[in-house]
């Protein structure tokens, strides 16, 4: 009887801990933590309540194509994105576009649910040290484990993006106030035709800097018009984290 009770207690504790970690992980991905941090003091995040920000598998990183490993067996990304009316929120660090539909991505045999996308200016990931004006992160979560997958899209100045017009024109007037958009969007409009990518294991690029995030960076950039870029940077012109040491990590390249 005693053994049964101890086993039951252990099972309950395991369930509680797993549920707590899953909840915290999903919350950190759903919305940026808006307390006690800013981009001007990004190097101090680990000393101001976010110790994981000094971890050894942090994001973003610089990509050097010559040092990546081309793996013949890397699978294609399978996007299952559908039309939906998004929910928009200015979370005091960026404009965030929350899911309000059924959108998934399958990668390496796992299917992840789309949670939200948001903007960084300039790009956080660099290519041989070079930045682009904007980087978009599409954040996804494994519904079973809570594991996170982030698809990064570099954005150059060029042709306007119709989807982003709908989003930028619906920017909420009040910060931290989520509004439902009446516009219909499809996330495939944020993706190029060529979906070759770089991938590595990193972290969220904002506090709490949760590690173990799978990053997939689409090689071919998309474009926004100069006016669209300015519309974002007039409000947030420095919401990027500096590149972090790669340490012993490998960046893989699909072809």
Residue ranges and their predicted role:
Residues 4-6, 10, 25-255:
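Alpha-carbonic anhydrase
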Residues 8-18:
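Sec-dependent N-terminal signal peptides
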Residues 18-19, 46:
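Residue-level signal for mature regions of secreted extracellular proteins and peptides
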